[in-house]
């Protein structure tokens, strides 16, 4: 009769079985923790009470019950020596007993966990997607099987444009170079499922003679599969179409620095903490570090998208030494020309200061004398200009050090006034005065 009633009873569902197993597992884990605490408590109590008892008995025996015979004293000392050994033996027994209990508890816990894992695998095989997902989220949240169930949804097919050839490339041809997955047991069905579910996303529309066009972006999981190690995380989809660019002007330093590199950076004072990062303006990739002094004046080409990033500022350039010497010569020539122009009006004023009576009494002889005087003045002016040109040529040939080494005051006194200061036309003024006196 009991067998018939047992057959008529309905079997418990998987959720009920898992709930019961979850409760048993929790109780076993609590018992294990409690057993560990009890072992520590009992061992500590044993040591505490045994030491107190040992001290009290030794004091009482020594003060009141110390025997007088030699054999009795030896027996009492032997008992006092055996008491610590007895306590140590009791401690080992307690530890063995509690360890045996924990081993039995752990065995039962492992059996329950194995049964639970087996039931969850059956749920993955037999139950529907929705029910299996609910059960796994409730009883096994840390499992990776939930991610296996979340397959990507295939996107709509791409319609070709008129006048263009549709090139269909299967996902298997594109993902030949994909590396093996991390989980070997679960990687092959996942990759095959993704490849079978996303054939439409791998289509490209391209016209003959034109660049390929991509209108649909792949799913994140397919991106994860197609991404190779070493490629930047912020790569643009159209960057794969660009041809490889020129090589970099400078090598990119590795991120991981060794102990020797750190010591050298500390001694020299040149490390990542003293540099600025070179970030590409287009793909925002890291292209190494630059010094603080050179950061604003550095122009670089990105190592990933080959975009030329211009410098933030232009470096100021110092003028050349030849230009400085030419500027000095120009200033000197300008000052000398102004002095010459002042001399000529002075001579004209002296001639015009003659009285009108003398101008009326001019004879042909006086006109000839004036013409001779004018020729003499012109010759003097030309000689002064030649001397000034020679001085300028000597100044241009000499270096700046020769200019700094000026002659002594005694030598300046011995030299004539025209050579010491060529800008002062003293002889010309004296000769013009003498000629004016002769005409008078």
Curated annotation (Swiss-Prot):
Residue ranges annotated as Lumenal topological domain: 67-77
PTM annotation, UniProt: Phosphorylated. Phosphorylation at Thr-159 and Ser-325 occurs during interphase. Phosphorylation at Ser-177, Ser-179, Ser-188, Ser-192, Thr-198, Ser-206, Ser-215, Thr-219, Ser-222 and Ser-231 occurs during mitosis; these phosphorylations reduce both its homodimerization and the ER three-way tubular junction formation.
Cysteines paired by S-S bonds: none
Gene Ontology cellular component terms for the protein in this record: endoplasmic reticulum membrane; endoplasmic reticulum tubular network; endoplasmic reticulum tubular network membrane
Start-end of C4-type zinc fingers: 280-305
GO biological process terms held by the UniProt record: endoplasmic reticulum tubular network maintenance; endoplasmic reticulum tubular network organization; positive regulation of endoplasmic reticulum tubular network organization
Compartment(s) of residence: Endoplasmic reticulum membrane
Bias-annotated ranges (Polar residues): 216-225, 334-343
Main location: endoplasmic reticulum
Topology of the protein relative to the lipid bilayer: Multi-pass membrane protein
PANTHER family: ENDOPLASMIC RETICULUM JUNCTION FORMATION PROTEIN LUNAPARK (PTHR22166:SF12)
Family affiliation: Belongs to the lunapark family.
Protein name: Endoplasmic reticulum junction formation protein lunapark
